[in-house]
Amino acid sequence: MSTRSVSIPTHALIEIIAAPVLMAAPFLLGFNLATGAVALALGTLLMGLAISTVTDQRTIPLTAHASFDYALAVATIVTGLVFGVATSDPVATAFLVGFGAAHLALTASTRYSARGA
């Protein structure tokens, strides 16, 4: 029995919903300019990554997608920690670290196989 219970289409749907949340957070939560710019860039990357999986002709292999997902999740966590220390902004830190941890959990729970085996 596999613990990876999230299918690729479900994973992509969650990312498509989550990416705008990450992009809107700097405006809604009042991040400083630098933290906001990085959050906006990470959200844009997440949206592009999600869109690359919903077409019949994937633009990147699923194994690469998994690697990019892990890297993006870790980058979001590190961004939250670095900017949290640099700016003393607990809201931005909590949001980015939490978002990155949730993305890491989603990535670890996803079956990266074309047929959902």
Regions found by a protein language model. Name each.
Residues 1-7, 25-34, 53-61:
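Short juxtamembrane and helix-loop transition motifs at transmembrane-helix boundaries
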Residues 11-31, 43-53, 69-86, 99-111:
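Extracellular/lumenal glycan-associated surfaces
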Residues 33-40, 88-95:
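Short, aromatic-rich membrane-interface segments at the entry and exit
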